[in-house]
Amino acid sequence: MAQSRLFFSADKAEAERTYNILEQAFEDDGFPIAITEIDEDRQIFEVSVYVEDDAEEVAARVDALVGPGLFDTEELPDIDWVTHSLEGLKPVRAGHFFVHGSHDRDKIEPGDIAIEIDAGLAFGTGHHGTTAGCLELIEETVETEHPTNALDLGTGSAVLAIAIARLAPIPILATDIDPIAVTVAAENAAKNGVAEHIVTATAEGFGHPIFRSYSPFDLIVANILANPLIELAPSIKEHLAPGGSIILSGILDSQHDAVLAAYQTQGLTHQKTLHREGWVAIHLT
């Protein structure tokens, strides 16, 4: 299947503005959209849209949204780019967590809470700034609040659910709208020796009956996108146990205030925000 990438680079503010426009416009299409810092000194960021087969149609839509001629297009070899990119990924440290691929087991140090996640079909290896920030808040929250159960909403690779389980042997529900992600999540939980603590389910939002069996939750973590987080604010609050904590990520710096306001409207209190590589992770109670 032919794969193409539409890409555009600009300063941080313009790149974030463009990313936000495209992320909202293509939310229902399923096209992966990424924003990456490519020049740290000059603060230049690149926005990419990955498409299959219909690159010309998508390019026309992009031109209509952000202006003609801004994005270039390149054809990509027909390979699994996420898996292929693992070769260039370095292990990530977030608090005491050490997230690594199978090729970096030799880099685990004494005292590390090691989580092995190979890049593949599900998003979330720990190499993304928003995931790293979330891991830091998870460590702090679990160690200070001692939750008795947890929910990882939009689990992806299950890196966050695994992190919770490595800190506390509590029941954890890990859900995702993508059945492939749910399969990968279960495999990763088993690989990391915490499968007995993590129950996985394919679910969109909170509509699945499994939530009735597990809620309310002392800890809810959700590393998805800003717009779904805002829409889900009432449901997330509804499924939170009294005195519980919520950790949100998948949020750009520029989206922080809107997401925070949605949860403060639900009566939640802002505890902390971590900023990592242009992304934020938010802790509320």
From Swiss-Prot:
A GO BP entry is: methylation
Give one Pfam family: PrmA
Q: Record's Gene3D superfamilies?
A: Vaccinia Virus protein VP39
Origin, by domain of life?
Answer: Bacteria
Q: Which GO terms describe its molecular function?
A: protein-lysine N-methyltransferase activity
Entry EC number(s): 2.1.1.-
Coarse class of the primary localization is cytoplasm
**Residues where S-adenosyl-L-methionine binds:** T131, G154, D176, N223
**What is this enzyme's class at the first EC digit?**
transferase
Describe the reaction catalysed, as an equation: L-lysyl-[protein] + 3 S-adenosyl-L-methionine = N(6),N(6),N(6)-trimethyl-L-lysyl-[protein] + 3 S-adenosyl-L-homocysteine + 3 H(+)
GO CC annotations, alphabetized: cytoplasm
InterPro entries xrefs: Ribosomal_L11_MeTrfase_PrmA, Ribosomal_PrmA_MeTrfase, SAM-dependent_MTases_sf
Q: Which UniProt keywords apply?
A: Cytoplasm, Methyltransferase, S-adenosyl-L-methionine, Transferase
Cell location: Cytoplasm
Q: Which residues form a coiled coil?
A: none
Q: Which HAMAP family match?
A: Methyltr_PrmA
Belongs to which family?
A: Belongs to the methyltransferase superfamily. PrmA family.
Q: What does this protein do?
A: Methylates ribosomal protein L11.
Record protein name field: Ribosomal protein L11 methyltransferase
- Name the gene for this chain: prmA
